[in-house]
Amino acid sequence: MNNVKDLQTIEETLKYLQFDNWEQSAPGLARSRELLGLLGNPEQKLKFVHIAGTNGKGSTAAMLASVLQHAGYRTGLYTSPHLLRFHERMRVNGEEIDDNSLISLTNTVRNAAERMSEMPTGFEIMTAIAFLYFVQEQCDIVSLEVGLGGRMDSTNVIPAPEVCVVANIGLEHTAILGDTVEKIAAEKCGIIKHGSHAVLFGQSESVENVAREKCAQEDVALTITAQEKLERISSSLDGQAFKYRGRGPYHLRLLGEYQLLNTLTVIDVCSALRSRGWDKLTDEAIDEGLSHAQWPGRLELLRRGPDFIVDGAHNPQCVDALMDSLAALYGDKKLIFLTGVLRDKDWQQMLRRALPLAKAFVVITPPSARALDENELAAWLNAQGVQAVPAKDTDDGVRRALELAGEDDAICSWGSLYFTGEVRRVLTEQ
């Protein structure tokens, strides 16, 4: 056994948690099971709502956590990646994990990991820390977001959750999850377990059929969200009001059509939880939770005059949803876009979708070996007939976007969650 010296400071702890070796590790749950066994199986002392999906799973997890908290349940929330700081990944009743808990629980998990024959991945270690934290904090229930996929994700070691949720599904991580939406859906639906209730975001028939098949195998009741039962009342930069399945009105603080549709999933999850005895989830609690829900970096309005919106859109499906939401908010008004893209993403398709709404672009090179150079991106955009200004970094990009904008203009930054976090940092420091 290795006698490793305990981590003493938050800086040391965060440095330790930065490693990510999942690409070098064989997929599977064996390492997580062994690690959690060494820690006394904290996951078996908790109740969960488990949430998978390509787009919207983080927003769904955050909105659900807000509703559960406002209903009076002590609620854990586990999400990834973080936007500004690591602590965001683990919250109880909206409060991020404190430094002392993070240091001491990381030491506990690290000491257990050192006793294993195969080192766990960074995400497996983080997930174990989160489970210990939620037990320590005596959570009634945890809103648990899957890291990647579902079936083989380290969060999938939990016993049957109260509700399994599958949010919107698209093509992503195809090398790991499969090259068709149906194969990816099968991986995501791998979180559905006997003894649970499943809720699926209403989408293509092929995905719905995959979910139905898995629920039949596991003998699990399935609810599919029904967009036709959504009645929109109002939508503005101040939020949205709506009814669903004849109930409401509900008020949502978050902007965007896609967030409104994610809310239907949350409401259906609450109905499933109510049927399992979580009877404090009244319509009043749902409304209260939705009207207070925050999910930074997703169609988030950071300032007015000019409006400055940030969004983490990073794939064609997300960009489609973002452009639909911006068109709904701003009508025919053209926007200034601040973005940077990765060469291995379908960047031309994403930018083509943004072109009809663009007054101009300010472009940067993201800090990644896979980044597309800002000058190359600006040249491509200029060739499409739109003004594009290259910027040397995020600070310069924000400055140039604000210089281009008049008081009545709107700026929207998008491209990745990391970039969104950087733009948020620059704007809040100004």
Q: Where do the model's predicted regions map?
A:
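Hydrophobic alpha-helical packing residues
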Residues: 64-69, 134, 273, 381, ...
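Beta-strand->loop->alpha-helix junctions that form or flank phosphate-binding loops
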Residues: 78-81, 200-202, 214-236, 253-257, ...
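N-terminal leader/targeting and accessory segments in enzymes
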Residues: 1-55, 59-74, 83-84, 138, ...
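Nucleotide phosphate-binding/pyrophosphate-handling subdomain across enzymes
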Residues: 45, 141-144, 152-165, 169-172, ...
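ATP-dependent carboxylate-amine ligase catalytic core
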Residues: 25, 29, 33-44, 70-159, ...
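Acidic, Mg2+-coordinating active-site environments of NTP-dependent enzymes
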Residues: 117-118, 138-145, 161-246, 263, ...
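C-terminal helical cap/extension that packs against the catalytic core
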Residues: 201-223, 237-238, 307-310, 316, ...
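Active-site-proximal loop/hinge segments that shape catalytic or ion-binding/gating pockets
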Residues: 416
